[in-house]
Amino acid sequence: MDMSSIASRLGLSGSRPVVRKAAELRRLCDVTFDSSVLGIGEVCKAIICLEIAASKFQVIFDRAEAVRMSGMSEKAYIRSFNALQNGLGVKTTLDVRELGIQFGCVRLIPFVQKGLSLYKERFLAALPPSRRASTDFGRPVFTAAAFYLCAKRHKLKVDKLKLIDLCGTSSSEFTTVSTSMADLCFDVFGIAKEKKDAKSIKGSRELLDVLPSKRKHDDDSDSSGESSGDDQDELDLPTYKRHKKMEKEAYNDWKSSVLSNKQTKPDPAKPRKQAQLNFKKKPSDMALEVSSAAN
Protein backbone atom coordinates (compact mmCIF):
# COMPACT_ATOMS: atom_id res chain seq x y z
CA MET A 1 0.00 0.00 0.00
CA ASP A 2 1.28 3.45 -0.90
CA MET A 3 2.42 5.78 1.89
CA SER A 4 0.14 8.60 0.75
CA SER A 5 -2.96 6.37 0.78
CA ILE A 6 -2.16 5.16 4.31
CA ALA A 7 -1.62 8.75 5.40
CA SER A 8 -4.96 9.80 3.93
CA ARG A 9 -6.75 7.01 5.82
CA LEU A 10 -5.08 8.18 9.03
CA GLY A 11 -6.04 11.80 8.43
CA LEU A 12 -2.50 12.97 7.58
CA SER A 13 -2.98 13.70 3.89
CA GLY A 14 -2.77 17.45 4.51
CA SER A 15 0.60 17.18 6.32
CA ARG A 16 3.03 16.77 3.44
CA PRO A 17 6.19 17.14 5.58
CA VAL A 18 5.00 14.24 7.73
CA VAL A 19 4.41 12.05 4.68
CA ARG A 20 7.83 12.91 3.21
CA LYS A 21 9.56 12.20 6.54
CA ALA A 22 7.71 8.89 6.88
CA ALA A 23 8.79 7.86 3.36
CA GLU A 24 12.38 8.76 4.26
CA LEU A 25 12.21 6.66 7.43
CA ARG A 26 10.76 3.76 5.46
CA ARG A 27 13.64 3.84 2.95
CA LEU A 28 16.13 4.06 5.82
CA CYS A 29 14.49 1.07 7.45
CA ASP A 30 14.74 -0.96 4.23
CA VAL A 31 18.44 -0.13 3.91
CA THR A 32 19.41 -0.60 7.56
CA PHE A 33 17.78 -3.93 8.47
CA ASP A 34 15.13 -6.40 7.45
CA SER A 35 11.95 -5.57 9.32
CA SER A 36 10.44 -8.99 8.58
CA VAL A 37 12.90 -10.47 11.08
CA LEU A 38 11.16 -8.41 13.77
CA GLY A 39 7.77 -9.68 12.62
CA ILE A 40 6.72 -6.33 11.15
CA GLY A 41 4.86 -6.32 7.84
CA GLU A 42 5.06 -3.66 5.17
CA VAL A 43 1.77 -1.99 6.06
CA CYS A 44 2.61 -1.94 9.76
CA LYS A 45 6.07 -0.56 8.96
CA ALA A 46 4.57 2.30 6.95
CA ILE A 47 2.12 3.10 9.76
CA ILE A 48 4.88 3.14 12.38
CA CYS A 49 7.03 5.39 10.18
CA LEU A 50 4.08 7.76 9.88
CA GLU A 51 3.66 7.84 13.66
CA ILE A 52 7.36 8.56 14.22
CA ALA A 53 7.24 11.36 11.65
CA ALA A 54 4.06 12.78 13.20
CA SER A 55 5.66 12.82 16.64
CA LYS A 56 8.67 14.69 15.26
CA PHE A 57 6.46 17.39 13.76
CA GLN A 58 4.15 17.47 16.83
CA VAL A 59 1.14 16.38 14.78
CA ILE A 60 -1.72 14.51 16.42
CA PHE A 61 -1.70 10.86 15.38
CA ASP A 62 -4.70 8.54 15.75
CA ARG A 63 -3.10 5.48 17.32
CA ALA A 64 -6.37 3.57 17.73
CA GLU A 65 -7.01 3.76 13.98
CA ALA A 66 -3.37 2.86 13.33
CA VAL A 67 -3.63 -0.27 15.49
CA ARG A 68 -6.83 -1.26 13.69
CA MET A 69 -5.22 -0.78 10.26
CA SER A 70 -2.10 -2.73 11.22
CA GLY A 71 -4.16 -5.80 12.19
CA MET A 72 -2.22 -6.19 15.44
CA SER A 73 -3.11 -5.90 19.08
CA GLU A 74 -2.18 -2.76 20.96
CA LYS A 75 0.62 -4.49 22.88
CA ALA A 76 2.07 -6.03 19.73
CA TYR A 77 1.89 -2.68 17.95
CA ILE A 78 3.71 -0.88 20.78
CA ARG A 79 6.35 -3.62 20.86
CA SER A 80 6.87 -3.29 17.10
CA PHE A 81 6.94 0.51 17.38
CA ASN A 82 9.66 0.42 20.03
CA ALA A 83 11.69 -2.15 18.10
CA LEU A 84 11.53 -0.16 14.86
CA GLN A 85 12.29 3.09 16.66
CA ASN A 86 15.35 1.60 18.36
CA GLY A 87 16.48 0.04 15.08
CA LEU A 88 16.34 3.40 13.34
CA GLY A 89 18.00 5.15 16.26
CA VAL A 90 15.19 7.69 16.46
CA LYS A 91 14.04 9.03 19.80
CA THR A 92 10.91 11.06 20.18
CA THR A 93 11.20 14.02 22.50
CA LEU A 94 8.47 15.97 24.21
CA ASP A 95 9.25 19.48 25.39
CA VAL A 96 7.48 20.86 28.46
CA ARG A 97 7.33 24.35 26.95
CA GLU A 98 5.64 23.10 23.80
CA LEU A 99 3.10 21.20 25.89
CA GLY A 100 2.39 24.29 27.96
CA ILE A 101 1.82 26.40 24.85
CA GLN A 102 -0.23 23.73 23.08
CA PHE A 103 -2.58 23.14 26.04
CA GLY A 104 -2.65 26.75 27.24
CA CYS A 105 -1.01 25.96 30.60
CA VAL A 106 2.20 27.98 30.45
CA ARG A 107 2.25 28.59 34.20
CA LEU A 108 2.69 24.84 34.78
CA ILE A 109 6.13 24.72 33.12
CA PRO A 110 8.24 25.39 36.27
CA PHE A 111 6.16 22.96 38.35
CA VAL A 112 6.59 20.20 35.76
CA GLN A 113 10.34 20.76 35.51
CA LYS A 114 10.71 20.72 39.29
CA GLY A 115 8.61 17.56 39.59
CA LEU A 116 10.59 15.75 36.90
CA SER A 117 13.95 16.53 38.51
CA LEU A 118 12.66 15.52 41.95
CA TYR A 119 11.19 12.28 40.60
CA LYS A 120 14.46 11.43 38.87
CA GLU A 121 16.46 11.95 42.08
CA ARG A 122 14.12 9.89 44.26
CA PHE A 123 13.70 7.11 41.70
CA LEU A 124 17.45 6.73 41.20
CA ALA A 125 18.02 6.75 44.97
CA ALA A 126 15.67 3.78 45.31
CA LEU A 127 17.49 1.74 42.62
CA PRO A 128 20.66 -0.30 43.16
CA PRO A 129 23.82 1.27 41.69
CA SER A 130 24.04 -1.36 38.95
CA ARG A 131 20.70 -0.32 37.42
CA ARG A 132 21.05 3.45 37.64
CA ALA A 133 23.06 3.80 34.44
CA SER A 134 20.49 1.96 32.30
CA THR A 135 17.52 4.05 33.43
CA ASP A 136 16.15 6.31 30.69
CA PHE A 137 14.14 9.33 31.81
CA GLY A 138 14.16 10.94 28.37
CA ARG A 139 11.09 9.06 27.19
CA PRO A 140 8.11 11.30 26.43
CA VAL A 141 5.82 9.35 28.76
CA PHE A 142 7.56 10.84 31.83
CA THR A 143 7.11 14.40 30.59
CA ALA A 144 3.48 13.80 29.63
CA ALA A 145 2.64 12.13 32.96
CA ALA A 146 4.28 14.93 34.95
CA PHE A 147 2.41 17.55 32.93
CA TYR A 148 -0.91 15.75 33.44
CA LEU A 149 -0.40 15.38 37.20
CA CYS A 150 0.56 19.04 37.61
CA ALA A 151 -2.49 20.13 35.64
CA LYS A 152 -4.69 17.92 37.79
CA ARG A 153 -3.16 19.29 40.98
CA HIS A 154 -3.76 22.88 39.88
CA LYS A 155 -7.31 22.00 38.73
CA LEU A 156 -6.69 22.63 35.03
CA LYS A 157 -8.40 20.57 32.35
CA VAL A 158 -6.02 18.68 30.05
CA ASP A 159 -7.00 16.10 27.43
CA LYS A 160 -5.46 12.88 28.72
CA LEU A 161 -6.01 10.94 25.49
CA LYS A 162 -4.33 13.67 23.49
CA LEU A 163 -1.32 13.54 25.82
CA ILE A 164 -1.09 9.76 25.42
CA ASP A 165 -1.16 10.13 21.64
CA LEU A 166 1.54 12.79 21.75
CA CYS A 167 3.92 10.74 23.87
CA GLY A 168 3.29 7.59 21.78
CA THR A 169 2.56 5.16 24.60
CA SER A 170 -0.31 3.03 25.82
CA SER A 171 -2.87 4.08 28.39
CA SER A 172 -1.74 1.33 30.80
CA GLU A 173 1.89 2.50 30.71
CA PHE A 174 0.79 6.11 31.15
CA THR A 175 -1.27 5.14 34.20
CA THR A 176 1.65 3.16 35.67
CA VAL A 177 4.08 6.06 35.30
CA SER A 178 1.53 8.52 36.70
CA THR A 179 0.93 6.33 39.75
CA SER A 180 4.67 5.96 40.35
CA MET A 181 5.18 9.73 40.14
CA ALA A 182 2.27 10.45 42.46
CA ASP A 183 3.63 7.98 45.04
CA LEU A 184 7.25 9.15 44.99
CA CYS A 185 6.54 12.89 44.67
CA PHE A 186 3.26 13.38 46.47
CA ASP A 187 4.35 16.84 47.63
CA VAL A 188 4.57 17.97 43.98
CA PHE A 189 2.09 15.77 42.09
CA GLY A 190 -0.25 14.48 44.79
CA ILE A 191 -3.79 15.66 45.41
CA ALA A 192 -5.09 15.90 48.96
CA LYS A 193 -8.43 14.16 49.31
CA GLU A 194 -10.97 16.10 51.31
CA LYS A 195 -13.47 14.21 53.43
CA LYS A 196 -16.96 15.08 52.28
CA ASP A 197 -20.09 15.11 54.38
CA ALA A 198 -22.23 12.05 53.76
CA LYS A 199 -25.37 14.16 53.59
CA SER A 200 -23.98 16.24 50.71
CA ILE A 201 -23.58 13.23 48.43
CA LYS A 202 -26.62 12.21 46.43
CA GLY A 203 -26.12 8.48 46.93
CA SER A 204 -25.69 8.92 50.68
CA ARG A 205 -28.86 11.00 50.87
CA GLU A 206 -30.79 8.23 49.18
CA LEU A 207 -29.31 5.72 51.62
CA LEU A 208 -30.31 7.89 54.55
CA ASP A 209 -33.85 8.05 53.21
CA VAL A 210 -33.97 4.26 53.00
CA LEU A 211 -32.80 3.75 56.59
CA PRO A 212 -35.46 4.98 59.04
CA SER A 213 -33.24 4.23 62.01
CA LYS A 214 -30.56 6.52 60.58
CA ARG A 215 -33.08 9.34 60.12
CA LYS A 216 -34.29 8.85 63.65
CA HIS A 217 -30.73 8.92 64.91
CA ASP A 218 -30.00 12.16 63.05
CA ASP A 219 -33.22 13.82 64.26
CA ASP A 220 -32.56 12.88 67.86
CA SER A 221 -28.95 14.08 67.67
CA ASP A 222 -30.03 17.41 66.21
CA SER A 223 -32.71 17.96 68.85
CA SER A 224 -31.32 16.53 72.07
CA GLY A 225 -27.88 15.18 71.20
CA GLU A 226 -28.74 11.74 72.60
CA SER A 227 -29.69 8.48 70.92
CA SER A 228 -30.91 5.13 72.12
CA GLY A 229 -28.60 2.17 72.49
CA ASP A 230 -30.53 0.05 70.00
CA ASP A 231 -30.16 2.64 67.23
CA GLN A 232 -26.46 2.99 67.96
CA ASP A 233 -25.95 -0.78 67.80
CA GLU A 234 -27.82 -0.91 64.51
CA LEU A 235 -25.75 1.90 63.02
CA ASP A 236 -22.54 0.12 63.98
CA LEU A 237 -23.48 -2.81 61.75
CA PRO A 238 -22.24 -2.95 58.15
CA THR A 239 -24.59 -1.84 55.41
CA TYR A 240 -25.44 -5.29 54.10
CA LYS A 241 -26.14 -6.58 57.63
CA ARG A 242 -28.43 -3.64 58.33
CA HIS A 243 -30.25 -4.33 55.07
CA LYS A 244 -30.57 -8.01 55.95
CA LYS A 245 -31.86 -7.15 59.42
CA MET A 246 -34.45 -4.78 57.93
CA GLU A 247 -35.65 -7.48 55.55
CA LYS A 248 -35.96 -9.94 58.42
CA GLU A 249 -37.94 -7.44 60.51
CA ALA A 250 -40.25 -6.73 57.56
CA TYR A 251 -40.81 -10.45 57.09
CA ASN A 252 -41.61 -10.92 60.79
CA ASP A 253 -44.09 -8.03 60.67
CA TRP A 254 -45.78 -9.54 57.63
CA LYS A 255 -45.89 -12.98 59.24
CA SER A 256 -47.41 -11.65 62.47
CA SER A 257 -50.04 -9.68 60.54
CA VAL A 258 -51.01 -12.79 58.55
CA LEU A 259 -51.30 -14.88 61.71
CA SER A 260 -53.36 -12.24 63.50
CA ASN A 261 -55.74 -11.98 60.55
CA LYS A 262 -56.13 -15.75 60.55
CA GLN A 263 -56.98 -15.83 64.25
CA THR A 264 -59.51 -13.01 64.12
CA LYS A 265 -61.24 -14.22 60.98
CA PRO A 266 -64.42 -16.26 61.73
CA ASP A 267 -64.59 -19.90 60.69
CA PRO A 268 -66.26 -20.39 57.36
CA ALA A 269 -69.83 -21.74 57.63
CA LYS A 270 -70.26 -25.41 56.87
CA PRO A 271 -72.32 -26.20 53.78
CA ARG A 272 -75.87 -27.10 54.76
CA LYS A 273 -77.80 -29.97 53.30
CA GLN A 274 -81.13 -29.22 51.74
CA ALA A 275 -84.01 -30.79 53.65
CA GLN A 276 -86.35 -33.14 51.85
CA LEU A 277 -89.69 -31.65 51.02
CA ASN A 278 -92.69 -33.76 52.07
CA PHE A 279 -95.91 -32.14 50.94
CA LYS A 280 -99.31 -33.48 51.94
CA LYS A 281 -101.08 -35.19 49.11
CA LYS A 282 -104.69 -34.54 48.16
CA PRO A 283 -107.29 -37.45 48.21
CA SER A 284 -107.71 -37.20 44.45
CA ASP A 285 -103.98 -37.67 43.94
CA MET A 286 -103.95 -40.69 46.26
CA ALA A 287 -106.82 -42.32 44.33
CA LEU A 288 -104.96 -41.87 41.10
CA GLU A 289 -101.86 -43.49 42.55
CA VAL A 290 -103.88 -46.54 43.81
CA SER A 291 -105.56 -47.00 40.45
CA SER A 292 -102.32 -46.80 38.60
CA ALA A 293 -100.78 -49.34 40.97
CA ALA A 294 -103.69 -51.74 40.47
CA ASN A 295 -103.38 -51.62 36.73
From Swiss-Prot:
Residues 212-295 are annotated as: Disordered. Keywords: DNA replication, DNA-binding, Nucleus. Gene3D superfamilies: Cyclin-like. It is found in: Nucleus. InterPro entries: ORC6_cyclin-like_2nd, ORC6_cyclin_first, ORC6_met/pln. Residues 220-236 have a biased composition (Acidic residues). GO terms for biological process: DNA replication initiation; pollen development. Pfam families: ORC6, ORC6_2nd. Coiled coil: none annotated. GO terms for molecular function: DNA binding. One of its GO terms (cellular component) is nuclear origin of replication recognition complex. Residues 254-263 have a biased composition (Polar residues). Component of the origin recognition complex (ORC) that binds origins of replication. DNA-binding is ATP-dependent. The specific DNA sequences that define origins of replication have not been identified yet. ORC is required to assemble the pre-replication complex necessary to initiate DNA replication. Belongs to the ORC6 family. PANTHER family: ORIGIN RECOGNITION COMPLEX SUBUNIT 6. Component of the origin recognition complex (ORC) composed of at least ORC1, ORC2, ORC3, ORC4, ORC5 and ORC6. ORC is regulated in a cell-cycle and development dependent manner. It is sequentially assembled at the exit from anaphase of mitosis and disassembled as cells enter S phase. This is Origin of replication complex subunit 6. It comes from Oryza sativa subsp. japonica. The lineage of its organism: Eukaryota, Viridiplantae, Streptophyta, Embryophyta, Tracheophyta. The gene is ORC6.
